[in-house]
Amino acid sequence: SHTSAAKDKFIKAYMDRARIAEIMAVFLEAGVDAVMGPLTPLMGEAARDAEDRVGRKMHLIVTPHFNILPGGPPEMEPGPVLDRCKEMGATFCFPHSSMVDALVDRLNRTIRQYDTYAKMIRERGMIPGLSTHLPDSVVIADESGADVESYIQLFNAAGFLMPIEVDWAMRIIQKAAKP
């Protein structure tokens, strides 16, 4: 929910595998065949249940986070995390905003280490992209020719969780080189 601990707790308690699969199945039946979310077994299992029920593939857009500095837990190193994304059945792998935005180097107009991560994503047969709250990420990725097939860019008219003005974010999204 990103709005309160209580709402987050309620959603996690109420939305079990069966309920999530039921919602996914409704969307699959209506022709919506992609879902975006974090790297969790629950999302992958619910997607498989919905696929079995409807007979169509659900494309998973996974937004993992992993160590970007040395010294983190070994299971959170990029390789093992990306392996889990592939095992879960991800079609697309868009590193999460919590990491991407920290790697944006405005001075040198680059997203540090992203080329390495994109290569690792492609090596696992997934399609790379970026999940970001920072519109500069989109501009810098486009300018630098980063291996990005698409973006998840936060946008809402109220400006909730947006670091810049809504109209500026809208222009960046409209001018992005990739959808």
Task: For every predicted segment, state its role.
Residues C85-R106:
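Active-site groove signature of glycoside hydrolases
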Residues A34-G44, T132-S137:
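Gly/Ser/Thr-rich loops at beta-strand to alpha-helix junctions
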Residues A25-E29, G44-K57, G79-A90, D142-G145, ...:
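Acidic (Asp/Glu)-rich catalytic clusters
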Residues E51-G71:
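Long, hydrophobic, well-ordered secondary-structure blocks that form the structural core
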Residues S1, D33-M36, K57-I61, T91-F94, ...:
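Structural preference for beta-strand elements that scaffold enzyme active sites
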Residues S1-A34:
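N-terminal binding-site loop/beta-alpha segment at the start of enzyme catalytic domains
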Residues D16-R19, L42, I68-V81:
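Glycine-rich anion/phosphate-binding loops
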Residues F66-G72, D101-P179:
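Beta/alpha (TIM)-barrel catalytic core signal, keyed to glycine-rich beta->alpha loops juxtaposed to Asp/Glu
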